Swiss-Prot record:
It holds the Pfam family Ribosomal_S8. Keywords: Ribonucleoprotein, Ribosomal protein, RNA-binding, rRNA-binding. It comes from Methanothermobacter thermautotrophicus (strain ATCC 29096 / DSM 1053 / JCM 10044 / NBRC 100330 / Delta H). This is Small ribosomal subunit protein uS8. Part of the 30S ribosomal subunit. NCBIfam families: PRK04034.1 (NF003115). Transmembrane segments: none annotated. The gene is rps8. GO terms for molecular function: rRNA binding; structural constituent of ribosome. One of the primary rRNA binding proteins, it binds directly to 16S rRNA central domain where it helps coordinate assembly of the platform of the 30S subunit.
Amino acid sequence: MTLMDPLANALTNIRNNEIRGNVKCRITPASKLIGRVLRTMQKEGYIGEFEYVDDGRAGKFIVELEGNINHCGVIKPRHAVKKDEFEKFEKRYLPAKNFGIIIVSTPEGIMTHKEAKDRGIGGRLLAYVY
Protein backbone atom coordinates (compact mmCIF):
# COMPACT_ATOMS: atom_id res chain seq x y z
CA MET A 1 0.00 0.00 0.00
CA THR A 2 1.34 3.41 -0.95
CA LEU A 3 0.99 6.38 1.34
CA MET A 4 -0.11 9.56 -0.36
CA ASP A 5 0.80 11.82 2.57
CA PRO A 6 3.14 10.37 5.22
CA LEU A 7 2.83 13.50 7.40
CA ALA A 8 -0.96 13.17 7.53
CA ASN A 9 -0.59 9.50 8.38
CA ALA A 10 1.87 10.30 11.20
CA LEU A 11 -0.35 12.97 12.77
CA THR A 12 -3.42 10.74 12.52
CA ASN A 13 -1.45 7.97 14.21
CA ILE A 14 -0.44 10.33 17.04
CA ARG A 15 -4.01 11.60 17.46
CA ASN A 16 -5.48 8.07 17.55
CA ASN A 17 -2.94 6.91 20.14
CA GLU A 18 -3.62 10.00 22.26
CA ILE A 19 -7.36 9.26 22.18
CA ARG A 20 -6.74 5.66 23.27
CA GLY A 21 -4.49 6.83 26.09
CA ASN A 22 -1.39 5.02 24.88
CA VAL A 23 1.97 6.08 26.28
CA LYS A 24 4.00 5.32 23.14
CA CYS A 25 3.30 5.50 19.44
CA ARG A 26 5.14 4.07 16.40
CA ILE A 27 5.27 6.11 13.21
CA THR A 28 6.29 4.48 9.94
CA PRO A 29 7.74 5.41 7.50
CA ALA A 30 10.19 7.93 8.95
CA SER A 31 11.32 10.99 7.03
CA LYS A 32 13.27 14.18 7.70
CA LEU A 33 10.07 16.23 7.45
CA ILE A 34 8.27 14.11 10.05
CA GLY A 35 11.33 14.26 12.32
CA ARG A 36 11.45 18.06 12.16
CA VAL A 37 7.70 18.33 12.81
CA LEU A 38 8.10 16.01 15.82
CA ARG A 39 11.01 18.13 17.09
CA THR A 40 8.84 21.25 16.85
CA MET A 41 5.99 19.52 18.71
CA GLN A 42 8.47 18.36 21.38
CA LYS A 43 9.91 21.85 21.78
CA GLU A 44 6.38 23.22 22.36
CA GLY A 45 5.62 20.49 24.94
CA TYR A 46 3.01 18.46 23.05
CA ILE A 47 5.02 15.22 22.98
CA GLY A 48 7.86 13.77 25.04
CA GLU A 49 11.04 12.17 23.76
CA PHE A 50 11.16 10.46 20.38
CA GLU A 51 13.78 8.31 18.73
CA TYR A 52 14.55 7.13 15.22
CA VAL A 53 14.87 3.37 14.75
CA ASP A 54 16.50 2.05 11.57
CA ASP A 55 14.66 -1.13 10.68
CA GLY A 56 16.44 -1.71 7.36
CA ARG A 57 13.53 -0.28 5.40
CA ALA A 58 12.17 3.25 5.65
CA GLY A 59 12.84 3.49 9.39
CA LYS A 60 10.41 4.47 12.12
CA PHE A 61 9.97 6.87 15.01
CA ILE A 62 9.00 5.78 18.52
CA VAL A 63 7.23 8.72 20.18
CA GLU A 64 6.41 9.12 23.88
CA LEU A 65 3.01 10.76 24.27
CA GLU A 66 2.29 13.12 27.16
CA GLY A 67 -1.49 13.47 26.81
CA ASN A 68 -1.24 17.16 25.88
CA ILE A 69 -2.76 16.95 22.39
CA ASN A 70 -6.46 17.63 21.95
CA HIS A 71 -6.35 17.59 18.16
CA CYS A 72 -3.76 17.66 15.39
CA GLY A 73 -3.85 17.38 11.62
CA VAL A 74 -2.33 18.50 8.35
CA ILE A 75 -3.34 21.57 6.43
CA LYS A 76 -4.32 20.78 2.85
CA PRO A 77 -3.70 22.45 0.48
CA ARG A 78 -0.41 23.71 1.82
CA HIS A 79 -1.17 27.44 1.70
CA ALA A 80 1.64 29.88 1.01
CA VAL A 81 1.46 32.57 3.70
CA LYS A 82 3.10 35.98 3.89
CA LYS A 83 4.45 37.27 7.18
CA ASP A 84 1.34 39.36 7.91
CA GLU A 85 -1.31 36.73 6.97
CA PHE A 86 -0.91 34.31 9.89
CA GLU A 87 -3.89 35.66 11.86
CA LYS A 88 -6.37 34.62 9.16
CA PHE A 89 -5.19 31.03 9.37
CA GLU A 90 -5.01 31.11 13.19
CA LYS A 91 -8.73 31.89 13.18
CA ARG A 92 -9.40 29.08 10.72
CA TYR A 93 -7.38 26.23 12.26
CA LEU A 94 -6.96 27.01 15.97
CA PRO A 95 -9.82 27.14 18.50
CA ALA A 96 -8.68 30.34 20.26
CA LYS A 97 -6.03 33.01 20.02
CA ASN A 98 -2.74 32.02 21.71
CA PHE A 99 -3.93 28.40 22.03
CA GLY A 100 -2.14 25.82 19.88
CA ILE A 101 0.40 26.11 17.10
CA ILE A 102 0.52 26.05 13.33
CA ILE A 103 3.65 24.37 11.97
CA VAL A 104 5.16 26.27 9.04
CA SER A 105 7.85 25.37 6.52
CA THR A 106 9.97 28.48 5.93
CA PRO A 107 13.22 29.17 4.09
CA GLU A 108 14.90 29.06 7.52
CA GLY A 109 13.48 25.64 8.42
CA ILE A 110 10.38 24.22 10.05
CA MET A 111 9.02 26.28 12.94
CA THR A 112 5.82 27.43 14.61
CA HIS A 113 3.78 30.32 13.27
CA LYS A 114 4.71 32.34 16.36
CA GLU A 115 8.44 32.04 15.62
CA ALA A 116 7.85 32.91 11.95
CA LYS A 117 5.85 36.00 12.97
CA ASP A 118 8.62 37.10 15.35
CA ARG A 119 11.28 36.67 12.65
CA GLY A 120 9.10 38.38 10.02
CA ILE A 121 9.12 35.55 7.47
CA GLY A 122 6.40 33.65 5.64
CA GLY A 123 6.21 30.09 4.39
CA ARG A 124 3.90 27.18 3.72
CA LEU A 125 1.48 25.84 6.31
CA LEU A 126 2.04 22.16 7.12
CA ALA A 127 0.02 21.22 10.22
CA TYR A 128 -1.78 22.42 13.32
CA VAL A 129 -1.70 21.14 16.90
CA TYR A 130 -3.71 22.13 19.96
